[in-house]
């Protein structure tokens, strides 16, 4: 019997240990913006209400068990019945209603406030007043378009802090779900309609997070659903304006001889039919079937999941399916030799927005 209790105790500790796993600032319990703060407050409020209810019911439950135990009242004693007691009937009807009212009022108020995306649809809207980002989810990558600036990026969302950023969400293939746990809870991306919402990124808490947050797909979409990650880089409004100017003036140029070989291979293998290498991609959405590779050389991840070192980039180029199963890149080009992947790596790592 003692062994069974030890096993039960051990199993009970497993969830506690697992709760400590995960990445920094990939948790709803570390809110870093206006939306996340409100959602966290509602979580705390609802949890407190439930804790109070469970505590009161548990106290009454154990009191009855102890007070009317057989050894104390005897075999044939029947406790006083309270059926039809008006005071008790009113009490256990009114209290739940009051608790629901306490919970419903902030939920409704916050829902209406967080659903207000009218500033993004105003005529004459300026990006400085209401920045809009079009998010397009694909199997298994993300595209971010800044329509006010004519900029398109992939896998890394760049946003200013301390202001509302408005999002148009849609999907190009199947249903996905856009989620940045630390900044605001998720919203689906659909193929047949657009969803809209806004998020804010608090500058102080962004600094604490190293100006970096992590986003995920929160809707099961295929074999690499768990690998459909993206990164969010935050910066001040002034720095953001500087970034947009850099991106507008961005030109992809290969410098070394090996990089130039990689550029020629990139064209020869017809990579440009799917990938763009500059952020001002004018093609229609239907033609943008693969991630935009502008600033690839500044990214810390390849395919959103592996460290962007030479070994991993070459492994991705040789066999994408070994890193992200089900991706659409696999089998679209002939097998590459080591010399070809070396040249392509050199070219791709040179794609940067930084001044050259």
From Swiss-Prot:
Record CDD domains? CuRO_CcO_Caa3_II
Spell out the Pfam families in the cross-references: COX2, COX2_TM, Cytochrom_C
- What does the note accompanying the cofactor annotation read? Binds a copper A center.
Q: What reaction does this enzyme carry out catalytically?
A: 4 Fe(II)-[cytochrome c] + O2 + 8 H(+)(in) = 4 Fe(III)-[cytochrome c] + 2 H2O + 4 H(+)(out)
- Give the transmembrane ranges: 48-66, 88-106
Cellular component (GO) terms are: plasma membrane
- EC main group: translocase
| Its EC number(s) | 7.1.1.9
Q: Which segments constitute the Cytochrome c domain?
A: 258-356
- Stretches the record annotates as Cytochrome c oxidase subunit II: 21-257
Q: Which residues lie on this side of the membrane: Extracellular?
A: 21-47, 107-356
What the protein does comes down to: Subunits I and II form the functional core of the enzyme complex. Electrons originating in cytochrome c are transferred via heme a and Cu(A) to the binuclear center formed by heme a3 and Cu(B).
The name this protein carries in UniProt is Cytochrome c oxidase subunit 2
What's the name of its gene? ctaC
């Amino acid at each position: 019997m003692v062994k069974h209790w030890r096993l039960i105790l051990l199993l009970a500790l497993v969830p506690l240990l697992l709760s400590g796993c995960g990445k920094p600032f990939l948790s709803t319990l570390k809110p870093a913006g206006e939306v996340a703060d409100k959602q966290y407050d509602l979580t705390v409020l609802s949890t407190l209400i439930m804790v109070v209810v469970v505590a009161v019911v548990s106290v009454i439950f154990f009191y009855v068990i102890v007070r009317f135990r057989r050894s104390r009242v005897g075999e044939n004693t029947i406790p006083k019945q309270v059926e039809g007691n008006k005071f008790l009937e009113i009490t256990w009807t009114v209290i739940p209603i009051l608790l629901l009212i306490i919970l419903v009022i902030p939920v409704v108020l916050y829902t209406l406030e967080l659903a207000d995306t009218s500033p993004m649809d105003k005529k004459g809207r300026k990006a400085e007043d209401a920045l809009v980002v079009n998010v397009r989810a694909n199997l298994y990558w993300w595209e971010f378009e800044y329509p006010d600036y004519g900029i398109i990026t992939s896998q890394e969302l760049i946003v200013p802090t301390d202001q509302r950023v408005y999002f148009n969400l849609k999907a190009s293939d199947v249903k996905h779900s856009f989620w940045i746990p630390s900044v605001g809870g998720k919203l689906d991306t659909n193929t047949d309609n657009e969803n809209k919402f806004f998020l804010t990124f608090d500058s102080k808490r962004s600094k604490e997070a190293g100006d970096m947050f992590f986003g995920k797909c929160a809707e099961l979409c295929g074999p690499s659903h768990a690998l459909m990650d993206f990164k969010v880089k935050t910066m001040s409004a002034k720095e953001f304006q500087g970034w947009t100017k850099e991106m507008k003036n961005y030109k992809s140029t290969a410098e070394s001889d090996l990089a130039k070989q990689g550029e020629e291979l990139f064209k020869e293998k017809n990579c440009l039919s799917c990938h763009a290498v500059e952020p001002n991609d004018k093609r229609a959405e239907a033609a943008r079937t693969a991630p935009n590779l502008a600033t690839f050389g500044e990214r810390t991840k390849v395919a959103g999941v592996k460290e962007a070192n030479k070994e991993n980039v070459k492994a991705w180029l040789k066999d994408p399916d070994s890193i992200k199963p089900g991706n659409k890149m696999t089998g679209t080009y002939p097998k590459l030799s080591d010399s070809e992947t070396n040249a392509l790596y050199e070219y791709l790592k040179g794609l940067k927005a930084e001044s050259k």
